[in-house]
């Protein structure tokens, strides 16, 4: 779930992180819970204003209604949600996608 960095904070505890190359070759900083090593969120270093949050780690995952799926080129056909935007890889304009998510959240 993409969101703007200014709208995101970790509510409790600290995370561990590591930098890994993403599909585009750019570095992504992946944050994990230090106790269970579950990924919580990812910073896309090429897009410093955007954070990718894992919805299952939210206190209220109901706020994470999908509006799009990325990297569908690697997904099984049964895993692609109907009625959402699909991108075979990363979308060209991530900020526009985040804006669409925010508009959906406010609706």
Residue locations for each model-derived region?
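A short Gly-Trp-Pro
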Residues: 1-107
């Amino acid at each position: 779930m993409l969101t703007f960095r200014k709208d995101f904070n970790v509510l409790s505890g600290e995370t561990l992180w590591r930098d890994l190359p993403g599909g585009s070759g750019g570095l992504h900083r992946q944050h994990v819970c230090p106790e269970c090593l579950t990924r919580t969120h990812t910073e896309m270093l090429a897009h410093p204003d955007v954070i990718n949050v894992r919805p299952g780690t939210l206190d209220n995952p109901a706020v994470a209604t999908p509006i799009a799926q990325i990297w569908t080129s690697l997904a099984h056909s049964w895993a692609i949600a109907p009625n959402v935007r699909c991108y075979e890889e990363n979308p060209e304009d991530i900020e526009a996608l985040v804006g669409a998510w925010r508009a959906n959240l406010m609706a």
